[in-house]
Curated annotation (Swiss-Prot):
It comes from Danio rerio (Zebrafish). Heterohexamer; composed of 3 copies of TIMM8 (TIMM8A or TIMM8B) and 3 copies of TIMM13, named soluble 70 kDa complex. Associates with the TIM22 complex, whose core is composed of TIMM22. One of its GO terms (cellular component) is mitochondrial inner membrane. InterPro entries: Tim10-like, Tim10-like_dom_sf. This is Mitochondrial import inner membrane translocase subunit Tim13.
């Protein structure tokens, strides 16, 4: 059992993961999860709004509705994200 965790307790960096690398990986994973959630919510909302009778194809009005709905959803998401990030920056400046 002596070897268990020895890479972490020893001074060598061969077995250690760099904290910065781990943080970057976590940030990427969070960004991917957020993008997946955004896409899923947008798809659900726009489908419910624009598709009255699901079929094998979308008619012209459904295609236009989906495109406009997704554009509006993304615009709203970006507006909220900018406002949220701005607020976080202001709060961090006061700390």
């Amino acid at each position: 059992m002596e070897g268990f965790g020895s890479d972490f307790s020893s001074g060598s960096s061969s077995g250690k993961m760099d904290t910065g690398t781990i943080m970057e990986q976590v940030k990427v994973q969070i960004a991917v999860a957020n993008a997946q959630e955004l896409l899923q919510r947008m798809t659900d909302k726009c489908f419910k709004k624009c598709i009255g009778k699901p079929g094998s194809t979308l008619d012209n009005s459904e295609q236009k509705c989906i495109a406009m709905c997704m554009d509006r959803y993304m615009d709203a998401w970006n507006t909220v994200s900018r406002a949220y990030n701005s607020r976080l920056q202001r709060e961090r400046a006061h700390i």
